[in-house]
Structures are given as C-alpha cells and as structure tokens.
C-alpha cells in the first residue's frame, strides 16, 4: 500500500518557529515530527511513502528526507483536497496529515487491513476546535462537522485515512471552501453518503501540533514516555542530577550545575558552570546554557545559546538563537490570568497561566532584554540592549523600544 503524508501547509499558526523550517520538522526530543510518522508507517510494513509539500519547501524536504519520495502540490489551489490531487494512486492509499504526532502505530496497522474506506477518530476534551465525527447506528461515518459550536460528541477526525481511488471522483464534485481551500473532508462527506466509511477509534496519545505551545506539550509527553535516563556525555564533579535525565553523546555538564528532571540534553550541548535546568527542559542539540542561567519547561532547538545570567520559562526557542547577558523571559502575568498569544491574526488564550515567549530562528538579543509573556519574535530579528519587548516582533525586525 502507498502512504501519503500531507505536509504542504504554510505552518502559519506555528510562526515564528516555522519562519525557518516546515512544521513537519518541529523537533520532538532528538527527531523531527515527520520521522516519527515515517517510522510508524514502516512498522506497519508500508515502504512506498510520498510526502506532498509546497514548492517553497521542496528543497528543504529533499535535503532532509533523501530516501523518501517528495511531490510538490500545485501552488494555485490550497488545502488538503488539493494535496490529494497531487497524489497519484490507482487502488488505495493511507493518508496522514503532516502536523500530527501519535504515540504508536497500532490503529494504522489495523486500518490498512480493512477492505472498505476508513477514518481514524480520537476523543479529545475540546472537540469544537476540530472536525467532529458523526456516526450512524452501525458506527460508520455519517459526516464530519467542522468546528461546531455545540459538538455532538468528543470524537474528532484524527487526520488519518485509508481511502480508495474513488476519492478523486468526489474531489471533482466539491467547491472551494469559505476559507479558500479545497477540503478533503468535504469530499469524504460526499463519499460517506454513497459508500461505507468505517471509523476506527485511536486509543493512544494524539496531538495536533497546531499552536506554538503544543510544541512544549508534545515534547513533555515524549520526555515522559519515549526515553529512559542515560548519561552518554561528560559530567564534571559537583554536578547534582535529580530524577529522570537524558544526557546524549558529547554533551558536557560543568561543575556547579543542578539538573532537576525530567530533562533532555541533546548531543554536543554544553551546560554550566552553575546552571539550573528545571523539569521539562528540552535541549535539542548543540545548545549552550551558561553560568547563572535557569531554564524551565522549554524547548530550545539546534545550536541556540543562552550563555549567561538569563531566565527562560515555558518557552520555545528555534535554532541558532543567541541571548545577550541578562535576557529574561517572563512567563506569568501580574494578574495571573491565562496568557494570550496572537495566532494567525487572532489573539487567543493559551489556556496556560504560565507561558513565556516564542522565538524564531537566528534571533539575537542585546544585554538586559526583557520579553513579556506570550510574545512572539520573528526569525532574524534583533532586539536592542535594554529593550522591554511587550509586543510581537516581525521577521527580521530591529526592535529598540
């Protein structure tokens, strides 16, 4: 069977992290999201895997996924339905959205054995944010209702389908949606009127990485469930390690450092002297956390450096960021209300009382910079010394206030 991973989306909701990488390459501990998907497909015996990408990101995917077929979605039409039109299969195929993390392959291995079309559903606590599955009295799909104000159930579309080539007939029958996209779910709703579409409920951990703080959520789950304590690096005397801590190859932990797990320290990272890593610190690879730096519940990506006298809490920092001395990220409002973040032009609540900042790749801050809760700083931005960053900063912007 063929499998198609739909990864042509712009990743706008995950900005500024996606200013410099497709969302399929958001890291989960040491591996990008898409590598977990490919691994699970191969465990189910699927070898013919194609990733549907945008023309903008094709070169990035080809460089990173050398053994996987890469196909470009046409630029004139957006949406998951348009991505399927770029896929070519004559019999049947497995379709997976490229921004999903799921904890095991069991239901995928199950769904590909079915004779009929099928969709995987998953139960969530916030169904009105997703497409909700409506079932008939035989537990087959009746229809998918997108983001209903009053959801009929908490079983939602998990973004994993097994479809035969009839789907192309139904894609030809639908129109562009109100948001300007050709929607795969519209075609599936038509298909469900004519053919049985079986619903399989997913029972493991599932996460749609659709908002910047979901990067923290999924990494926390992975740290709790996918790895075990190990030390493959070099730890100097007078280092205190407490709880579950993973130290990868060529990492160096210098004297006076206190590490309170669970913590993940990626390959080639340098910690200390006298650093404090608190629970759910994830350092992806070749990071530097220097003297008198405290990090808590944050994902810090490849090559980023926080050399001295800084605090980072509940934040996501993309690759090759460098903080000047005394850079502080605040993660709690004075009124202790939930932190709001601008996502795709709308200011929404994160549902978190503690949330720091989201820093794009290659950002530089001067000394004594303060960044307020929920702020996003675009890739390649420069923050001048002494600035208090109280609003979002754009891609490449120089912020002086």
Swiss-Prot record:
Q: What is the effect of changing residue 80 to A/G/Q?
A: Increases both GlcNAc-1-P UTase and Glc-1-P UTase activities
Q: Where does a ribonucleoside 5'-triphosphate bind?
A: 8-13, 73, 79
Describe the effect of residue 308 to A. Strong decrease in GalN-1-P AcTase activity and almost loss of GlcN-1-P AcTase activity
Q: What is the effect of changing residue 80 to N?
A: Loss of GlcNAc-1-P UTase activity
**Enzyme class, UniProt record, top EC level:** transferase
Cofactor(s) required for function per UniProt: Co(2+); Mn(2+)
How is activity tied to temperature here?
Optimum temperature is 95 degrees Celsius for glucose-1-phosphate thymidylyltransferase activity.
Q: How is the cofactor bound?
A: Can also use Mg(2+) and Zn(2+), with lower efficiency. Important for nucleotidylyltransferase activity.
- Tell me the keywords, alphabetical order: Acyltransferase, Cobalt, Manganese, Multifunctional enzyme, Nucleotide-binding, Nucleotidyltransferase, Transferase
Q: Which GO terms describe its biological process?
A: UDP-N-acetylglucosamine biosynthetic process
Region described as Nucleotidylyltransferase: 1-220
Identify the metabolic or biological route this protein is part of: Nucleotide-sugar biosynthesis; UDP-N-acetyl-alpha-D-glucosamine biosynthesis; N-acetyl-alpha-D-glucosamine 1-phosphate from alpha-D-glucosamine 6-phosphate (route II): step 2/2; Nucleotide-sugar biosynthesis; UDP-N-acetyl-alpha-D-glucosamine biosynthesis; UDP-N-acetyl-alpha-D-glucosamine from N-acetyl-alpha-D-glucosamine 1-phosphate: step 1/1
Catalytic activities: dTTP + alpha-D-glucose 1-phosphate + H(+) = dTDP-alpha-D-glucose + diphosphate; alpha-D-glucose 1-phosphate + UTP + H(+) = UDP-alpha-D-glucose + diphosphate; N-acetyl-alpha-D-galactosamine 1-phosphate + UTP + H(+) = UDP-N-acetyl-alpha-D-galactosamine + diphosphate; N-acetyl-alpha-D-glucosamine 1-phosphate + UTP + H(+) = UDP-N-acetyl-alpha-D-glucosamine + diphosphate
The Gene Ontology terms for molecular function here are: glucosamine-1-phosphate N-acetyltransferase activity; glucose-1-phosphate thymidylyltransferase activity; nucleotide binding; UDP-N-acetylgalactosamine diphosphorylase activity; UDP-N-acetylglucosamine diphosphorylase activity; UTP:glucose-1-phosphate uridylyltransferase activity
Q: What's a Pfam family this protein contains?
A: Hexapep
Activity regulation remarks: GlcN-1-P acetyltransferase activity is inhibited by divalent cations. GalN-1-P acetyltransferase activity is enhanced by Co(2+), Mg(2+) and Ca(2+), but inhibited by Zn(2+) or Mn(2+).
Effect in UniProt of substituting residue 97 to H/L/M/N/Q/S: Increases GlcNAc-1-P UTase and Glc-1-P UTase activities
Q: Which domain of life is it from?
A: Archaea
The record describes its quaternary structure and partners as:
Homotrimer.
Q: What is known of its domains?
A: The C-terminal domain is essential for the formation of the trimer and the high thermostability of the entire protein. The C-terminal 11 residues are important for GalN-1-P AcTase activity, but they have an inhibitory effect on the GlcN-1-P AcTase activity.
State the similarity comment.
Answer: In the N-terminal section; belongs to the N-acetylglucosamine-1-phosphate uridyltransferase family. In the C-terminal section; belongs to the transferase hexapeptide repeat family.
- This one is known as Bifunctional sugar-1-phosphate nucleotidylyltransferase/acetyltransferase
* Organism, scientific name: Sulfurisphaera tokodaii (strain DSM 16993 / JCM 10545 / NBRC 100140 / 7) (Sulfolobus tokodaii)
- Organism lineage: Archaea, Thermoproteota, Thermoprotei, Sulfolobales, Sulfolobaceae
